[in-house]
Amino acid sequence: MIILRKAAHVFFDNLLSVFCLPFKLNNRVCIFNSTGNVNYNFNSRFLFEFITKQRDSQLMCYFVVNDDVLREKLLNSGHRNIISSKSFKNKILILQAKAWICSTIEPPVGCFIKRRQRIVYHLGHGVPLKNIGMAENQISLVKRINRYIKLRMFSHVTCYSLFFKDVLYRAFNKNDAIDYLFLGQPRNDTILAESGECKIDLTISSLGSFSEKEFFQSKKILYCPTWRNYAKTRFFPFTDFEPIELNRFLEQKNIIIFTREHPYYKFEKPRGIENIKRIVPLNADVLPDVTPYLSCFDLMITDYSSIFIDFMITEKPVAFIPYDLEKYEKLVGFSKPYKEITSGKYIHSFSQFLHVIGNDSFSGYTKEYLSNFNVKSRGNCLEHYLKIQELIKLD
């Protein structure tokens, strides 16, 4: 029934799109969306909020959130122009908009009829370290067709830098009609924003049983491995792992490790972790978007997640646990050689893990390395805003 209902919505949206074809697009309307049209997150959220705060803006911006509970919560908290794409009125509004601005490849309505006059603008939700889109390894025929239909809609794609242009070019099916933009990630404007440290402390201090002094003086580590489509992702994947020893070490060094799982994939943690008070879950149900709070952590540990690129803005160290690197390269694949796109210490054992988290030495990142990712803490939203204004060409 669910599949039939979705198919009916797609059929209706495309029929409505055909009906709207003779009418001119509204140059002043921009529609934003994010994952599945049900979330309010990623780069589209931050650019939407930036543009709506510009008093001189002639743009009318709307953000599609089809989750009724979340939409109501956002509206009640003071957000404006948060809409559903399920009503007839809003479908017309969306189909007549000059620009669709997306964090993912999902359109704001189930329409796959491309209008050459419309700007379909891809912001992305992280610099692609892994193969994505049409460049992903081992794509099924059904997924390939689905991606082809969606990807062909885009007119402009953020590729961050010249270093990553070929990556996005392959991901978007080597489409030469797309304009690839060397612009940064809007969400990165929030990382070093004023009072970020206060925000994170107020948000997460209640998650653990720490005294105020203990919490504020602690070394805070964000441990956030990425997804696997072939197995559960393992936290602390060491054959010599000792939870009792880890607990003792964290207490002695006044370290708190915040573990963050990918919201859409399964994870596995070793026994005994649940008894360590200094290991605190910080998943999406507690903190939907961790980006604005990255400056509050002293060290990041990951495996293949692109979140470490955002974290480099803080000029703090990153460590990597590539415990299944060969398998990941074969089944998922990287957009660039792994050792070329990572800069930090590699951890292969529990003893190395303790050494890294207990050591504060860090030599920093080179300018050349940072330029590959177009890493900057300000001006990202503004450059996208100016680009969109230029493309729309308001009178």
PLM features: what roles do these ranges have?
Residues 83-99, 263-309:
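Donor nucleotide-activated moiety binding/catalytic core segment of transferases
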Residues 1-37, 42:
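Membrane-proximal basic amphipathic "stem/tether" segments
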Residues 2-17, 133, 146-231, 263, ...:
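A nucleotide-sugar donor-handling region in carbohydrate enzymes
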Residues 376-395:
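C-terminal alpha-helical cap of glycosyltransferases
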Residues 42-49, 53, 186-272, 347:
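Conserved catalytic-core segment of nucleotide-activated headgroup transferases in glycan assembly
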Residues 100-107, 111-124, 128-131, 287-331:
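A donor-sugar binding/catalytic signature common to diverse glycosyltransferases
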Residues 29-195:
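Active-site and donor-binding regions of nucleotide-sugar-utilizing enzymes
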